Regions:
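Conserved hydrophobic "DFG−1" position in protein kinase catalytic cores
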Residues: 72, 92-94, 224, 235-236
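Residue-level detector of conserved, well-ordered beta-strand and adjacent loop positions
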Residues: 65, 71, 83, 235-237
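C-terminal regulatory/interaction regions
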Residues: 173-239
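Active-site HxH/HxHxD metal-binding segment of metal-dependent hydrolases
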Residues: 1-71, 98
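A short linear boundary/processing microfeature
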Residues: 12, 108, 116, 194-195
Length: 239
């Protein structure tokens, strides 16, 4: 297979968890986010299932890197790497035919999940995502034909990228406003999600909430304070 550097390493790390017990670092991470005990138990039960849902990973692969040009059939594709949704998301751009294979990095209707995970609790993937959106705006023509991994092909890439940027910036504004009174990560769901959060998407919603909170912290717009039980409370920074 042809892949970037980080993806195979992350996949092997996840696959290595198969059949293992949930680590205490993960339990502390979700407890700090405000998980109730029944959701903590669900995390423990579901941990280590990744390897059961994917094919066996190859023992070797061909690494592809940013800026590399790959020939597939009669077309030449330039590699553009995005971040935020995944630590390294490979996209392909054919300048001659004005086609961009975006995968999950640029979708026409929904915004890809951008989450903080227990393995890197202080990460700032939302800023990485915003940087990647601006990078794609600079690298692609607006009328490029975008081939996403979900929904239909589309054009007007610059408009869609700006919509994604504006959506996350607006989300952070709402989270900051909500945190005028101290909130846990699980308390800021209403500021970010219109749909109902269920047991099935609770983990993704939590990871995305922490991504917005970590980005706000990096911008010195909120502060985080742990309580005696290890739960993190977020408060808007004073003006």
């Amino acid at each position: 297979g042809w892949e970037g550097l980080v993806g195979p390493l992350r996949s092997r790390n996840l696959a290595a968890d198969t059949g293992q017990e949930a680590p205490q670092e993960g339990v502390r991470f979700y407890r700090a986010a405000g998980y109730p005990e029944d959701m903590i138990e669900q995390y423990k039960t579901r941990f280590g299932m990744f390897g059961h849902g994917v094919y066996r990973l190859p023992n070797s692969y061909r690494r592809i890197i940013e800026g590399e040009v790959i020939e597939i059939g009669t077309r030449k594709w330039r590699v553009i790497v995005g971040t935020g949704h995944a630590p390294e998301h490979v996209c392909l751009y054919c300048e001659a035919d004005n086609i961009f294979i975006s995968g999950d990095q640029l979708l026409p209707r929904i915004s890809s999940n951008v989450s903080v995970h227990p393995t890197e609790p202080e990460a700032n993937p939302l800023q990485d995502w915003l940087n990647s959106c601006n990078k794609l705006k600079a690298a692609l023509p607006d009328e490029v034909l975008v081939l996403p991994s979900h929904n239909d092909p589309f054009r007007k890439a610059h408009l869609r990228l700006q919509e994604l940027i504006d959506g996350h910036e607006s989300g952070m504004d709402k989270v900051q406003e909500l945190c005028r009174e101290p909130k846990r990560a699980v308390d800021v769901f209403p500021a970010l999600f219109r749909s109902r959060i269920t047991a099935g998407n609770y983990g993704m919603a939590t990871g995305e909430s922490i991504a917005h909170l970590n980005c706000l912290r990096a911008r010195n717009r909120i502060v985080r304070t742990p309580d005696a039980n290890g739960v993190n409370w977020y408060s808007s920074s004073p003006p």
